């Protein structure tokens, strides 16, 4: 009986362990997807494309699974919260402009995380590379 109980306990622990490893792997790959979208946005430097890159990064990350979706939300929320403080300092935007843009960014983030096509936000003329 003790052997049976021990085997059950070990299998449960190992099962939970593998789920966490999968989650963290998805989160890591999702963070890389977010970084790739950010890097592409900086490289493209295309006016009006930021919402597309927000949606694309979140979409790609969420496709990895729950860990990727979690990473996308954490990174997106952190980015928006940081910008809330840095934009007035470095860009001179007023709080109304910053809040409006932040809400639009968060809508694009959620659009992508929910599995909807990020091309909805793709501006005309953005090179096919992106």
Swiss-Prot record:
SMART domains: SAA
One Pfam match: SAA
Post-translational modification: This protein is the precursor of amyloid protein A, which is formed by the removal of residues from the C-terminal end.
Signal peptide region: 1-18
Gene Ontology terms: cellular component: high-density lipoprotein particle
Induction: Upon cytokine stimulation.
PROSITE patterns: SAA (PS00992)
Main subcellular localisation: secreted
GO biological process: acute-phase response
Region (Disordered): 86-130
Entry-linked InterPro entries: Serum_amyloid_A (IPR000096), Synovial_Prolif_Regulator (IPR052464)
Gene3D superfamilies the UniProt entry points to: Serum amyloid A protein
Sites of Pyrrolidone carboxylic acid modification: 19
Family: Belongs to the SAA family.
Functional description taken from the UniProt entry: Major acute phase reactant. Apolipoprotein of the HDL complex.
Disease: Reactive, secondary amyloidosis is characterized by the extracellular accumulation in various tissues of the SAA protein. These deposits are highly insoluble and resistant to proteolysis; they disrupt tissue structure and compromise function.
Entries under PANTHER family matching the protein: SERUM AMYLOID A (PTHR23424), SERUM AMYLOID A-2 PROTEIN (PTHR23424:SF30)
Protein name, UniProt field: Serum amyloid A protein
Source organism phylogeny: Eukaryota, Metazoa, Chordata, Craniata, Vertebrata
Gene name for this UniProt entry: SAA1
């Amino acid at each position: 009986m003790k052997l049976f109980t021990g085997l059950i306990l070990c299998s449960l622990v190992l099962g939970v362990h593998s789920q966490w490893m999968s989650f963290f792997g998805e989160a890591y790959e999702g963070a890389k997807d977010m970084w790739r979208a950010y890097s592409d946005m900086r490289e493209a430097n295309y006016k009006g494309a930021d919402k597309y890159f927000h949606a694309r990064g979140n979409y790609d990350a969420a496709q990895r699974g729950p860990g990727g979706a979690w990473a996308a939300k954490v990174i997106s929320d952190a980015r928006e919260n940081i910008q809330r403080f840095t934009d007035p300092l470095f860009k001179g935007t007023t709080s109304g402009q910053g809040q409006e843009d932040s809400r639009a960014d968060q809508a694009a983030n959620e659009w992508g995380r929910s599995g909807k096509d990020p091309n909805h936000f793709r501006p005309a003329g953005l090179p096919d590379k992106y």
